[in-house]
């Protein structure tokens, strides 16, 4: 599951249909990186884990496309909302919030953000920080001002616009992933054609980490944690 750019079914930058990533490892990459486990969102270690920025049909990335998770159409407030986070400080015309979701669930990029009364204040713009202690920024709606919010004011989200953190963590030892070169199915081998799995790299994933383990978030806009399209 990677984001930014992408052909049909692709998960990360550039890439043909069904391809997973431009740089590294087996399955679910974030964007770029060295080898090894651990993980970070946008950058960092190799393969497994999951990824944000990407594009193409079926992907999570920034551009539109079918089957993606971002660029949500405004369909009015959801039936119910759950706690997403707390206001920390303004940043130019945006606001920065600490994520306080249950079980550290990760919001989709571009997912609408609400007050408790379901009034929309903006959309999730960036995610950054450590895997289990992260923040997000909100790009405010035109009628909202960053200076109008108080410290620790709570914000809410549609529960269907959250993903479990486990989606971005390395697999437990001994757990097998999909066959090499599989993933998107269809033609192609390593690095890119249809169904390709990407070259090099180990398992890992993560948010914006450095090489190998550890890791933090640093995601961009997009669906599903994810820089991308409509759900």
Curated annotation (Swiss-Prot):
Mind telling me which Gene3D superfamilies this protein's record contains? Probable tRNA pseudouridine synthase domain (2.40.10.230)
Q: According to the UniProt entry, where is the signal peptide?
A: none
**Residue span of region Disordered:** 1-75, 167-231
List every stretch annotated RGG-box 2. 180-231
List the InterPro entries: Gar1/Naf1_Cbf5-bd_sf (IPR038664), H/ACA_rnp_Gar1/Naf1 (IPR007504), Transl_B-barrel_sf (IPR009000)
Q: Where is the composition biased (Gly residues)?
A: 1-68, 179-231
- Which Gene Ontology molecular function entries are recorded, alphabetically? box H/ACA snoRNA binding; snoRNA binding; telomerase RNA binding
GO BP, sorted A to Z: pseudouridine synthesis; rRNA processing; telomere maintenance via telomerase
UniProt keyword annotations, A-Z:
Isopeptide bond, Nucleus, Repeat, Ribonucleoprotein, Ribosome biogenesis, RNA-binding, rRNA processing, Ubl conjugation
| Region named RGG-box 1 | 4-68
Pfam family example for this protein? Answer: Gar1
Site of covalent link Glycyl lysine isopeptide (Lys-Gly) (interchain with G-Cter in SUMO2):
145
Where does the protein end up?
Nucleus, Nucleolus; Nucleus, Cajal body
Q: Briefly, what is this protein's role?
A: Required for ribosome biogenesis and telomere maintenance. Part of the H/ACA small nucleolar ribonucleoprotein (H/ACA snoRNP) complex, which catalyzes pseudouridylation of rRNA. This involves the isomerization of uridine such that the ribose is subsequently attached to C5, instead of the normal N1. Each rRNA can contain up to 100 pseudouridine ('psi') residues, which may serve to stabilize the conformation of rRNAs. May also be required for correct processing or intranuclear trafficking of TERC, the RNA component of the telomerase reverse transcriptase (TERT) holoenzyme.
Which PANTHER family is this protein grouped with?
H_ACA RIBONUCLEOPROTEIN COMPLEX SUBUNIT 1, NUCLEOLAR PROTEIN FAMILY A MEMBER 1 SNORNP PROTEIN GAR1
What does the annotation say about its assembly with partners? Part of the H/ACA small nucleolar ribonucleoprotein (H/ACA snoRNP) complex, which contains NHP2/NOLA2, GAR1/NOLA1, NOP10/NOLA3, and DKC1/NOLA4, which is presumed to be the catalytic subunit. The complex contains a stable core formed by binding of one or two NOP10-DKC1 heterodimers to NHP2; GAR1 subsequently binds to this core via DKC1. The complex binds a box H/ACA small nucleolar RNA (snoRNA), which may target the specific site of modification within the RNA substrate. The complex also interacts with TERC, which contains a 3'-terminal domain related to the box H/ACA snoRNAs.
Note on domains (UniProt): Interaction with SMN1 requires at least one of the RGG-box regions.
Q: Could you tell me what this protein is called?
A: H/ACA ribonucleoprotein complex subunit 1
Q: Which organism is it from?
A: Mus musculus (Mouse)
Quote the gene name from the UniProt entry: Gar1
